[in-house]
Amino acid sequence: MPEEALLTIVVKAALVVFIVITAFAYLLLWERKLIGRFQVRYGPNRVGPLGYLQPLADVVKLVFKEDAVPAGANRILFSLAPLISIAAAVGAIALVPFGDPTTYLGHQVNFFGADLDISLLVLFALSGLGFYGLILGGWASGNKYSLLGSARTAAQLVSYEVAMGLSAVGVVMAAGSLSLVDIVQAQADFTWYVLVQPVGFVVFMIAAVAETNRAPFDLPEAESELVAGYHTEYSGLKFSMFFLAEYVNMIVISGVGATLFLGGYSGPGLPGWLWLAIKVTVLLFLFIWLRATLPRLRYDRLMKFGWKVLLPVATANLLVTAVVVGLAFER
């Protein structure tokens, strides 16, 4: 491999890690401040100017906390589980396109990790792989509450992943490609797929909230029932990895939603990466708004909603899309 190509890969990897860590830190701060506003109180405002050094204080606190391993735990899998979760989340974000290719010092620079013909499929595979970390973490802890949290995670993943996939297939049919770059380019003239696939967008976002274990679908870690769910026995840096993976998954799934339905990085006047950041921020605000507004569902209702409401709606939307695309193709 040429040295320039290797250097490009290293720089891209370092940039992705920097973006992920920075976005996580200030997304967490933004969430705490927003929820404070929703509840008519102040959020973090003591550490640094207006509280903007609070993420740094949280990191220092977690670094110095004891990293305990339960006596009955499988030590190898217990340590490996958070690494699987964070690696899958960071790997997935590298597939989201941030902008059109540009030229720098005579070389083409792409604003994405890899433009694969099946990048959407690979991204879903990586996202699903991250849940094995949650399942392994709960099982390896040797704790009944952790195991129940893992079982709930597996059931919730199976229940909502199908509906999310079906909602994405409608976009793939309309764009005629599984490449995220091609899907963005198909919406470049402001024919955003949220306008032609509104039902698919709603299904995708509901499933996205469930896939990231966010309220009101945060049953795998319901503190009133399971202490803390799959990460009950985790502390210190291992706990922070699970925490980081959850928020990175929120960013990834918001990036995918913006790419599939809101035109991704396309838009007039502003740089592509800034357009994508604006759209992702809007979708992240929806995550936080739902957390501050809606109560947690009962577990049986969560399952019934996934199988008896969301999946039939996603299937009907896909069938209608297939008919419309087929008729348009014949013409």
Language-model segments: what does each one mean?
Residues 1-331:
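Selective transmembrane helix interface/packing segments
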